[in-house]
Amino acid sequence: MTVKPLYRRVLLKASGEALMGEQHFGIDVSVVDRIAADIAEARGLGIEVGVVIGGGNIFRGVAVASKGGDRVTGDHMGMLATVINSLALRTSLHKIGVDAVVLSAIAMPELCESFSQRQADAYMNQGRVVIFAGGTGNPFFTTDSAAALRAAEIGADALFKGTQVDGVYSADPKKDPNATRFERISHAEVINRGLSIMDTAAIALARENNIPIIVYSIHEKGGFGDILRGGGRCTVVADD
């Protein structure tokens, strides 16, 4: 029996740190390949997929600012890190026969196309995976905010946030053994409780555009596909 997926079009946000695997820096190709396989599974279900990847495995602009450096320049460097990660994911997708394209918020035509909402929509309608690089193209905005923005622009039915844990918890489960996982929670409650799944601007933007956020563990092999079919372990952030 074929299970009909719950969504037509989704945006997947993966942190740059997730790409490190067990390393302390850079890209673990096996991890990128696994994420690519999860995306391929979603495409096999007929779901259109957009992707935003952070750059924290290579560079974080906010870290520069915390040490007295220039935040704007640091953020620009972080944007370049997201392009590196996006190209790595595109390569992994191409290896398994999935058509993918990188659209960057920063013009660099020798490496990838520049972002255009219309072009992104057209590519997704054609069944291509669209990887959005370069954040929003502006400093002081996180890649979480970029993910929420792109999700709104492409009309995504949901924003999937692949994290280090399998959902939203009342406290950090790595520090508090009594932390409990929410099955469902509203955007407003996430903000009011100060739960750090995404920055406040990203959550607010998703809320304003009625985009549910699905928080799950990106390290769970096949977890993305399980949730797309209506199963899996996750937290749904949505207003009733």
Swiss-Prot record:
Catalyzes the reversible phosphorylation of UMP to UDP. Belongs to the UMP kinase family. Pfam families: AA_kinase. Its EC number is 2.7.4.22. Signal peptide: none annotated. It catalyses: UMP + ATP = UDP + ADP. The keyword Ion transport does not apply. UMP binds at residues 55, 75, 136-143. InterPro entries: AceGlu_kinase-like_sf (IPR036393), Asp/Glu/Uridylate_kinase (IPR001048), Uridylate_kinase (IPR011817), Uridylate_kinase_bac (IPR015963). One of its GO terms (cellular component) is cytosol. Pathway: Pyrimidine metabolism; CTP biosynthesis via de novo pathway; UDP from UMP (UMPK route): step 1/1. It is found in: Cytoplasm. ATP binds at residues 13-16, 56, 60, 163-164, 169, 172. It comes from Mesorhizobium japonicum (strain LMG 29417 / CECT 9101 / MAFF 303099) (Mesorhizobium loti (strain MAFF 303099)). Keywords: ATP-binding, Cytoplasm, Kinase, Nucleotide-binding, Pyrimidine biosynthesis, Transferase. This is Uridylate kinase. It comes from the Bacteria.
